[in-house]
């Protein structure tokens, strides 16, 4: 005991001068060798150890072309670097799956979350979340290509008249020149809109669209296309389940041994999530169309050049939003058709289940009737096995008569169990219980 007291006094004399003085706090590192510290990660486990996010930046250069680069940011530094409040940034964060699609209009910025793409749009740059995602990569390629084509359209529009005149002079026919001109325009439209989505915005505003509207349109198009692909995938799964069910229709126990109902419930839950996302996106577009201030504040390039918001015509933005609203309505209609197909198929599955239950009940009734009839015949035959004197065994025809009775009774029992439905109807008619 005396030894431990001396050791504690010596340790206190060594430790206190170094711990109390802030200048000599570095020398206390060697004390960790003599202390047993618990790991904080084991006590308080962190779920999200990786707080970094890969951002795709698309910036418009002075010559009009796009400068694309990927940057890795910390989520803690992202609000300060992008100058966006944390409350708004949380709504479009791809790591948070609890929020629905949103379109937020703030000062000099548009915040967009469609369910597949989350982006921050300014008048001269765009920040896309999750730069390694395939949809984001496709959006980046489309934005850069369309910016190049907008620059090339200025020279093409000047040379279109000269091309038509040269074609007319060579062929001496104005009709052929017009047809060739239509082919040139159709090729350009197909190159711009290869997403199989009707894009009226670029048809009427080719080469005149602002950068923010270009990014908004491409992100919305790609997201709607992804919604269509998900809906088609769900539709294919439903078809496969229906085909499996048709193959097993001849099996009486098919609905009780397979997992079709469980798979259908999973598909229905996924379809419900998809409908909620589409409905949220649709309501956000409608809110912007009904709010004139938000419509005017979305002209970021115009507001950057003109500080005073004197904008009167918002027709190009209305065309853009109404086009995507129409596409979401059509997609929502297709989704409702798939839901009706699922409900119809569920009703058929329930009817099949009821039919199988009735078959089991009927089988149980047949077994009970057959056991009743065979028990009666067994009672008759058991008379020969008794040790009592009943004077039946002395007769020469007794065995023949009893065997004929048992065989006839068994035939009657088989006939009754085979046509048990008529027997049950007879019991129901005369209230036999």
Curated annotation (Swiss-Prot):
Q: Which residues form a coiled coil?
A: 257-298
Q: Which SUPFAM superfamilies match?
A: Magnesium transport protein CorA, transmembrane region
Q: Which GO terms describe its molecular function?
A: magnesium ion transmembrane transporter activity
Primary localization class, coarse = mitochondrion
The cellular location(s) given in this protein's UniProt record come to: Mitochondrion inner membrane
Q: Tell me which family the UniProt entry assigns to this protein.
A: Belongs to the CorA metal ion transporter (MIT) (TC 1.A.35) family.
- Tell me the function of this protein: Mitochondrial inner membrane magnesium transporter required for mitochondrial magnesium homeostasis. Involved in the development of the sporozoite in the mosquito vector midgut.
> Which protein is depicted?
Mitochondrial inner membrane magnesium transporter MIT1
Annotated organism of origin: Plasmodium berghei (strain Anka)
**What taxonomic classification does the UniProt entry list for its organism?**
Eukaryota, Sar, Alveolata, Apicomplexa, Aconoidasida
Gene this chain is encoded by: MIT1
């Amino acid at each position: 005991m005396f030894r431990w007291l001396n050791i504690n006094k010596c340790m206190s004399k060594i430790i206190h001068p170094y711990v109390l003085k802030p200048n000599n706090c570095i020398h206390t590192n060697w004390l960790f060798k003599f202390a047993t510290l618990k790991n904080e990660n084991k006590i308080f486990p962190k779920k999200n150890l990786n707080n970094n996010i890969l951002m795709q930046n698309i910036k418009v250069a002075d010559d009009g072309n796009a400068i694309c680069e990927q940057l890795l940011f910390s989520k803690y530094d992202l609000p300060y670097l992008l100058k966006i409040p944390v409350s708004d940034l949380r709504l479009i964060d791809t790591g948070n799956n609890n929020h629905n699609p949103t379109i937020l209009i703030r000062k000099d910025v548009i915040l967009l979350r469609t369910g597949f793409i989350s982006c921050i749009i300014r008048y001269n740059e765009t920040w896309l979340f999750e730069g390694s995602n395939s949809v984001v990569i496709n959006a980046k390629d489309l934005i850069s290509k369309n910016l190049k084509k907008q620059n090339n359209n200025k020279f093409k529009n000047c040379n279109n008249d000269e091309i038509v005149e040269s074609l007319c002079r060579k062929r001496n026919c104005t009709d052929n020149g017009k047809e060739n001109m239509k082919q040139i325009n159709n090729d350009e439209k197909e190159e711009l809109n290869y997403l199989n989505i009707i894009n009226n915005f670029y048809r009427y505003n080719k080469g005149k669209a602002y950068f923010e509207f270009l990014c908004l349109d491409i992100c919305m198009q790609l997201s709607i296309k992804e919604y269509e692909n998900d809906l088609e995938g769900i539709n294919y799964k439903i078809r496969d389940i229906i085909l499996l069910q048709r193959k097993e229709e001849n099996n009486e126990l098919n609905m009780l041994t397979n997992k079709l109902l469980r798979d259908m419930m999973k598909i229905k839950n996924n379809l419900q999530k998809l409908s909620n996302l589409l409905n949220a996106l649709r309501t956000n577009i409608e809110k912007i169309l009904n709010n004139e201030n938000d419509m005017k504040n979305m002209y970021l390039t115009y507001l950057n050049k003109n500080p005073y918001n004197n904008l009167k015509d918002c027709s190009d933005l209305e065309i853009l939003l109404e086009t995507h609203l129409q596409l979401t309505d059509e997609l929502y209609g297709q989704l409702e058709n798939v839901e009706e197909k699922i409900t119809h198929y569920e009703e058929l599955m329930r009817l099949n289940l009821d039919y199988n239950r009735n078959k089991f009940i009927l089988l149980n009734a047949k077994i009970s009737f057959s056991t009743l009839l065979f028990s009666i015949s067994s009672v008759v035959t058991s008379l020969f096995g008794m040790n009592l004197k009943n004077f039946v065994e002395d007769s020469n025809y007794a065995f023949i008569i009893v065997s004929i009775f048992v065989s006839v009774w068994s035939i009657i029992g088989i006939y009754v169990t085979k046509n048990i439905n008529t027997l049950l109807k007879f019991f129901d008619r005369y209230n036999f219980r």
